[in-house]
């Protein structure tokens, strides 16, 4: 069994039957501001991210993507892990397309307004390829990834700030976190995609 297959099995076992994802959802909302996303509570929930109709690709979004907490979004989740069938059905019911494929196998070319990558690169087979595909797929890339964590059975990769900046072609920020389910050094930032055109935003 190669390291990636072993890591996928670990990930599937970690999620179990996916019925109770509350703690993961809380962690997501705590990291959302580091992606540059604004949480705007209303009378119904404190966990709400209003968007403006953007088309967003979430790479490795898992069974409970941040897109499920967003309003007014055209979402696509790409994740190869073997989750229960109802995970895809829930995404469909919420108007989110779910593709059980590897991020390395994506072939998108400037099809998205935004690409989101959060807490995923340490799990994948070829992290640099994921970044390359993300830069081709969207106008901007929002990223939050742990750095300097070492490798383990479920996390076959570890990264440095310099490594991620080189792949992304820009400067990010590093913060040390110790609460709300977020522990360790994290790299985060918003980066321009390969075909970003500032004139198109005017």
Predicted regions and their residues:
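Conserved beta-strand signature within the Rossmann-like core of class I S-adenosyl-L-methionine
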Residues: 138-148
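Conserved class I S-adenosyl-L-methionine
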Residues: 53-62
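Class I SAM-dependent methyltransferase SAM/SAH-binding core
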Residues: 61-105
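A conserved beta-strand element that flanks and buttresses the S-adenosyl-L-methionine
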Residues: 116
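Short catalytic micro-motifs in class I SAM-dependent methyltransferases
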Residues: 119-120
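A short, conserved alpha-helix within the catalytic core of class I
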Residues: 123-134
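Class I SAM-dependent methyltransferase Rossmann-like catalytic core
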Residues: 1-50
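Short alpha-helix
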Residues: 155-180
